[in-house]
Regions:
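Sec-dependent signal peptide hydrophobic core
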Residues: 4-9, 332-336
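Generic hydrophobic alpha-helical segments
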Residues: 7-11, 68, 118, 149, ...
């Protein structure tokens, strides 16, 4: 009986105490939290480790576009020419066609909500004339913002590099600086990064839905951007404002989307309590925005939710779904725990009876 009891206790020790244990064990490559009112660092862990930003870098695209709008060289209502180079981009997209015309602002929404790589390329060509010219603008802006030499942009979209190409590189600290500067220079940024849904085209119908699951789930969250491809892991730049305090968190290189989102939520909530408070307007509401104008016919495509899959070269829409069978494992653990508890109870009761 003693041997049986020892075996049962050993098995019980092997049952995980919590399904969330991996979050605290190895949640990310690096992370940082900034006080948006003062710029002070409230938390950092591996904040200078270089990693791949993936689609998060589209916030730099937005920065450059909004800079040009403020300067007057670009208008939000300007029509954007769609070229074959634009329509051949893979990954997450809105499937732009050379027969179509969309405005700068419509493509900005596609950039932030759908994480559309074709929209990123279209905006890059519209602003700079060439892809390489826009990438130069990105790196010049990085220097202007005082980002470290580690941060190097090689593309307007953040897709995995092809043969002979170099990857986009940044650090959590540099990217948090970028986000802070973007919000300060262009408060209207939050109008785009807080949008969770928008109809991009009417015929055939194409609806865009955000990849940022913190929106609508974390009170006060109004941005900013997620990123993912296989080698990059799951990353997010997020911001929350409550009661005059605002914090920005960047989490890079998580091995799982849920781990990334849980860690970002934890950091935002914890360090918002330590942030300075100044009078500020309420956060931008994450509301359904009006549909874009109808464009020329485009091929019917699957929605982003239907295009999940880790093998796709897509920095956001390929966030793989949770593996099937997770609920069965949970039920199995519960049943195993109940069985072990019953066996232990019977063993103890038998020992007491024998001892009388």
């Amino acid at each position: 009986m003693k041997k049986l009891l020892l075996i049962v206790l050993a098995w019980a020790a092997m049952v995980p105490a919590s399904r969330g244990a991996p979050i605290s064990r190895d949640p990310y490559l690096g992370a940082i939290v900034l006080d948006a009112n003062t710029g002070a660092v409230l938390f950092e862990d591996g904040a200078d480790r270089p990693g791949y930003p993936a689609s998060m870098l589209k916030l730099m695209d937005l920065f450059i576009v909004l800079d040009r709008v403020k300067q007057g060289s670009v208008r939000l209502e300007d029509p954007v020419l769609i070229t074959k180079e634009v329509s051949s981009i893979g990954g997450s997209q809105v499937y732009l066609d050379p027969r179509e015309k969309f405005t700068v602002e419509e493509l900005v929404y596609a950039l932030m909500i759908q994480s559309a790589n074709d929209a990123a390329m279209a905006l890059a060509l519209h602003v700079a004339g060439t892809r390489d010219g826009f990438v130069r603008m990105m790196n010049e802006k990085a220097k202007e913002l005082g980002l470290s030499p580690v941060t190097q942009f090689q593309s307007p979209h953040g897709l995995p590099p092809g043969a002979g190409q170099r990857p986009d590189i940044t650090t959590p600290r540099d990217f948090a600086k970028l986000c802070l500067a973007l919000i300060r220079a262009h408060p209207e940024t939050l109008k785009y990064t807080s949008a969770t849904f928008r109809v991009f085209r009417q015929e055939p119908l194409f609806e865009m839905r955000t990849h940022n699951r913190l929106l609508g789930n974390v009170p006060g969250c109004d941005g900013l951007k997620t990123g993912y491809f296989t080698d990059a892991g799951f990353s997010i730049a997020a911001t929350v404002q409550r009661d005059g305090a605002r914090v920005i968190a960047v989490v890079m290189g998580s091995v799982d989307r849920k781990v990334r989102d849980a860690k970002a939520t934890e950091l935002l909530g914890r360090y918002l309590l330590d942030a300075s408070r100044t009078p500020a307007p309420p956060p931008a509401p994450a509301v359904r925005t009006p549909p874009a104008a109808s464009a020329a016919a485009a091929p019917a495509v699957a929605t982003d939710d239907e295009a999940q899959g880790e093998d796709l070269p897509d920095p956001d829409a390929d966030e793989p779904a949770e593996k099937s069978g997770g609920w069965l494992k949970s039920v199995g653990l519960v049943v195993l725990g109940a069985f072990l508890a019953a066996v232990v109870g019977m063993a103890i009761q038998r020992r007491l009876l024998l001892g009388r």
